[in-house]
């Protein structure tokens, strides 16, 4: 029984436990449903909030887009309005221009009509005038045209001649300027000595007793020396000196060397004098050859005949107007070579011809003829080229220069001779030449004063303005030049300057 009761109690407890657990489970389920409903409600609320936020954001974006669109529309409207105003302005400007063009066309048409009327009137008047001119002149229109063309042709020829003269003058000025530049450059690059030659030589003596020994018993020593050398010995009161006088520099040099050797040796008698003169002659011959070789070395000339070299050396003791001829020849060679190089000519040929241009002066006192013809003969004899021979022949105008080298040699010769200090004259002949120069200028009518300046290389003539006009001044200058060339002998050239001055003087009171 107890077991039944216990079983019942167990069943009841089991059933009760089941119901209890069921009630607990139902309570939990209800609580979960509540939470689920709460979660759903929260989610719904959150979604609603987000929806509202999204709606607000969308509304803001739409609002901003609307504002931006309105701004762009305003800008476009403003741009369109500005373009419309510009178009209106252009249309107004075009309208004004069209009106102006129409007015101008009207004016042009009116003027064309007037011009056409004038042209027609002028043609009619011209026909009448031509007919009247033909009647008065007795010439037809064709004859008048021929006469007019002839006059025009003369005028054109005159204008062409004036133009040609102007061009020639410009060309001459340019050529003279270029020539001056070339000559100046050549002179600057060529160093030359001034004249220092003389017709006497002085031999110093150790004492005055030597003068008696030189004279010798009854003058036999001095006579022997003078006879052998052809030089005058001047023994005067000059202390401790003997003067050798002679116009042949080579003989004077032989006498000087022989006398110096005799003085140094101390034995002075005719036999010894003959011996010393012979030695001096050999020494001078050696020096002549050395001087010629030195000249060819200085000028860079090679291949000269030995006899021509000796003749060049003889020029060392030859002078012209006091100018040493060998130094002059070397200077001419340098100048001609420099100018030839500047002009694109043959500088070697110019230097060779310049060095040999005065070779005839070495023996012109021994042979007949002037130094030009003698130089030509010598150049032919010693096989110089035709170009060199032509330069020698043309340097003083004996032949017309046919080559540029011949012209340059003649120009270099004139420059070397005419430069200040190159040549000199005796004082007496110099003064006479200046006086004669001024006398020639004073002899012309209208000349007020004449002054020879620049050592006689220029004369300035003052003329009276009331008697000599500008054109007459040119004639006076040419006439004076002709008189100088025909009546005077002078080295180089003389510049003639005629000055005509007009002064107007008044006084303010």
Curated annotation (Swiss-Prot):
Matching InterPro entries: HD/PDEase_dom, HD_domain, HDIG_dom, KH_dom, KH_dom_type_1, KH_dom_type_1_sf, Ribonuclease_Y, RNase_Y_N
Claim: Transport is one of the keywords in the record: no
Record has Hydrolase as a keyword: yes
Cellular localization per UniProt: Cell membrane
SMART domains associated with the record: HDc, KH
PROSITE patterns: HD, KH_TYPE_1
Paired cysteines (S-S): none
One annotated Gene Ontology cellular component of this protein: plasma membrane
Job description of the protein: Endoribonuclease that initiates mRNA decay.
UniProt family annotation: Belongs to the RNase Y family.
This protein's name: Ribonuclease Y
């Amino acid at each position: 029984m107890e077991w039944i009761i216990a079983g019942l109690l167990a069943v009841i407890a089991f059933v009760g436990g089941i119901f209890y657990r069921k009630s607990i489970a139902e309570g939990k389920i209800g609580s979960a449903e509540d939470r689920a409903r709460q979660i759903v409600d929260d989610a719904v609320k959150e979604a609603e909030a987000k929806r509202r936020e999204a709606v607000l954001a969308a509304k803001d974006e739409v609002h901003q887009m609307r504002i931006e669109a309105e701004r762009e529309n305003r800008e476009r409207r403003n741009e369109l309005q500005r373009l419309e105003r510009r178009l209106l302005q252009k249309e107004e400007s075009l309208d004004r221009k069209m009106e102006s063009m129409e007015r101008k066309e009207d004016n042009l048409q009116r003027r064309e009509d007037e011009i056409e009327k004038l042209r027609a009137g002028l043609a009619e008047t011209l026909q009448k005038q031509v007919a009247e001119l033909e009647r008065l002149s007795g010439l037809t229109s064709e004859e008048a045209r021929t006469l007019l063309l002839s006059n025009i042709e003369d005028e054109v020829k005159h204008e062409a001649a004036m133009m040609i003269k102007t061009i020639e003058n410009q060309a001459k000025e340019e050529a003279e300027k270029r020539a001056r530049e070339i000559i100046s450059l050549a002179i600057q690059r060529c160093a030359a000595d001034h004249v220092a030659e003389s017709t006497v030589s002085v031999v110093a003596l150790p004492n005055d007793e030597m003068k008696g020994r030189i004279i010798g018993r009854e003058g036999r020593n001095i006579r022997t020396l003078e006879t052998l050398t052809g030089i005058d010995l001047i023994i005067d009161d000059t202390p401790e000196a003997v003067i050798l006088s002679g116009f042949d520099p080579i003989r004077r040099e032989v006498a000087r060397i022989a006398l110096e050797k005799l003085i140094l040796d101390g034995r002075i008698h005719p036999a010894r004098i003959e011996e010393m003169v012979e030695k001096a002659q050999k020494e001078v011959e050696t020096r002549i050859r050395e001087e010629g070789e030195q000249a060819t070395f200085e000028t860079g000339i090679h291949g000269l005949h030995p006899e021509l070299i000796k003749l060049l050396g003889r020029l060392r003791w030859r002078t012209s107007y006091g100018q040493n001829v060998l130094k002059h020849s070397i200077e001419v060679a340098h100048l001609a070579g420099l100018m030839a190089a500047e002009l694109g000519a043959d500088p070697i040929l110019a230097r060779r011809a310049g060095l040999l241009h005065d070779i005839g002066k070495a023996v012109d006192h021994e042979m007949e003829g002037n130094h030009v013809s003698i130089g030509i003969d010598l150049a032919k004899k010693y096989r110089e080229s035709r170009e060199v021979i032509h330069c020698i022949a043309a340097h003083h105008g004996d032949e017309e220069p046919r080559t540029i080298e011949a012209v340059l040699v003649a120009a270099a010769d004139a420059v070397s001779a005419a430069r200040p200090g190159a040549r000199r004259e005796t004082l007496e002949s110099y003064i006479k030449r200046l006086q004669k120069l001024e006398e020639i200028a004073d002899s012309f009518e209208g000349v007020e004063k004449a002054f020879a300046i620049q050592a006689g290389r220029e004369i300035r003539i003052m003329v009276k303005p009331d008697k000599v006009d500008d054109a007459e001044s040119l004639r006076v200058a040419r006439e004076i030049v002709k008189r100088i060339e025909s009546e005077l002998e002078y080295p180089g050239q003389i510049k003639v300057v005629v000055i005509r001055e007009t002064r107007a003087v008044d006084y303010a009171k």
